[in-house]
A protein has these predicted regions:
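Short, Gly/Pro- and small/polar-rich lid/capping loops
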Residues: 4-31
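Short beta-strand elements
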Residues: 21, 31-39, 43-49, 162-184, ...
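Conserved phosphate/anionic-ligand binding catalytic regions in large, soluble enzymes, centered on
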Residues: 22-24, 29-33, 112-135, 159-175, ...
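Conserved active-site and cofactor/substrate-binding residues in soluble primary-metabolism enzymes
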Residues: 28, 72-80, 92-102, 119, ...
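Structural signal for hydrophobic packing residues in well-ordered secondary-structure cores
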Residues: 37-41, 82, 86-93, 104, ...
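Metal- or metallocofactor-binding catalytic centers and their adjacent structured scaffolds
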Residues: 48-138, 147, 194, 222
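Mobile "lid/hinge" segments at catalytic clefts and subdomain interfaces of large enzymes
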Residues: 56, 149-150, 155-221
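Catalytic core of soluble alpha/beta enzymes
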Residues: 231-439
Length: 439
């Protein structure tokens, strides 16, 4: 991060906000915002977009002009929403992040942020935080810690959940379930965890080539081979871990994100790969079987986003030994998280900034989950940019886990490289989360 010479009289009021339509990693438009302060400092941020989105998420604003980007353009955000936000925030101190976010929420006036667009609001929210950190002459993770988690002690570098085999909406033509992830939990540091993950990724590629399976990659950098079953995907993954020289279940464990809402049709789970139609109980039985055969320790969105009874049943049957993660179930929303806590529907939450649409609301959900004893995983989206904000966020709140895709494609690797830099900055004052953070 660029260092500056601090001036006690520095004016950190917001002078102007600029924005631009840029492309995300899937070639679709997204929003980049730059906040300029009176003192001359700027902060820039860009926002991601999901493919398998929960129906309860905040709403992005798109142009819906079929002549531009098949309707996915964001010129309305750039030309209308951001100028309206600029008028609102001009003259405010960039250091008052909660007031900035609150004012944007009130200006929009809808729970889904559908007037200004969650993509407009979040871009400005993150850009303000970045400008505030630069103006304060401290790293972004330290700045976020001071604002939202001042009582949290120590610095934890997160275990990466690396999506090395892709299916579902991230990889058309592969299996139904979306993500098969490796988690290098035995590493002594993040730098070693990244090495272990990368070496396993390359071992996996070699194994797929040996089996004459395709090695093209999906949206998140994982391979998307055409195999006959989900168990075959898991078998290949375990073989790759061994080929890389690691012990499955000890050095490296496996996480799944089935994204079950995407194959939930007419009240049943349709696994076209196996030509099977399953009830919630039958799908849970599949998961139970897999955790016995393979070192699967985390299952995210194993059931559809409104299958609350199914999640409760899954927790009763597996929650004592498996991390049951709510993503589409919770959509980083306090009300849905409250319901999940009351029902005991999950023991972990996936946190995505653009699901709720402001930094402050995201931070509050993280704190709510922590207070209830849920594990927290900070996550990217399938349509990403080079912005590595989530790396700083994961360290700021001591999340202990982060999802940023495979160690492939620069928009994924940018987050991992940022964590390398943070670990080097913190040196002996930080520790790696390791397997204990899953318990």
């Amino acid at each position: 991060m660029r260092r500056i010479t601090m001036d006690p009289e520095m004016n950190t009021s917001i002078s102007s906000i600029r924005s631009q339509e840029i492309l995300d990693s899937r070639g679709n438009p997204t929003v980049e915002a730059t906040v300029l302060l009176d003192c001359g400092i700027t902060g820039t941020a860009s926002v991601p977009s999901g493919a398998s989105t929960g129906i309860h998420e905040s709403q992005e604003l798109r142009d819906n002009d079929p002549k531009r980007y098949k309707g996915k353009g964001v010129l309305h955000v750039v030309e209308k929403s951001i100028p309206a936000i600029e008028t609102l925030l001009k003259g405010m101190s960039v250091n008052d992040q909660r007031a900035i976010d609150r004012n944007m929420i009130e200006l929009d006036g809808t729970p889904e942020k559908k007037v200004l667009g969650a993509n407009a609001i979040l871009a400005v929210s993150l850009a303000c935080a970045r400008a505030g950190a630069i103006a304060s002459d401290i790293p972004l993770y330290t700045y976020l810690r001071k604002i939202y988690w001042p009582d949290v002690a120590g610095w934890i570098l997160p275990v990466p959940q690396m999506n090395v085999l892709n299916g579902g909406k991230h990889a058309p033509g592969s299996v139904d379930m979306q993500e098969f992830m490796i988690m290098p939990v035995k590493a002594p540091s993040f730098v070693e965890a990244l090495r272990m993950g990368s070496q396993t990724y390359h071992a996996l590629k070699s194994l797929l080539l040996e089996k004459k399976l395709p090695v093209g990659v999906g949206d998140e950098g994982g391979f998307m081979p055409k195999v006959s079953s989900h168990e075959e995907m898991l078998t290949v993954l375990v073989d790759a871990i061994r080929l890389a020289g690691y012990e499955p279940g000890n050095d490296i464990v496996i996480g799944l994100d089935p994204a079950a809402s995407e194959f939930f049709e007419n009240g049943a789970y349709m696994l076209k790969t196996e030509n099977a139609t399953l009830t919630s109980s039958e799908l849970i039985a599949h998961y139970q079987s897999w955790t016995e055969k393979f070192p699967v320790v985390s299952i995210e969105d194993g059931l559809s986003e409104d299958d609350w009874d199914g999640f409760v049943d899954m927790m009763k049957k597996m929650g004592d030994r498996v991390q049951i993660v709510g993503d589409d179930l919770f959509v980083t929303h306090p009300d849905r998280l409250t319901k999940g806590i009351e029902l005991h529907a999950a023991n972990a939450i996936l946190v995505k900034l653009n699901q709720i649409g402001t930094l402050s609301e995201t931070a509050d959900v993280i704190s709510q989950a922590r207070q209830a004893g849920l594990k927290t995983i900070i996550s990217h989206r399938s349509g990403e940019t080079e912005d590595a904000f989530i790396a700083d966020l994961a360290v700021a709140c001591n999340a202990g886990q982060i999802k940023s895709g495979a160690p492939c494609r620069i928009e994924r690797v940018a987050k991992y490289n940022r964590l390398l830099h943070i670990e080097r900055e913190l040196q002996s004052s930080s520790q790696f989360a390791t397997f204990s953070f899953l318990r």
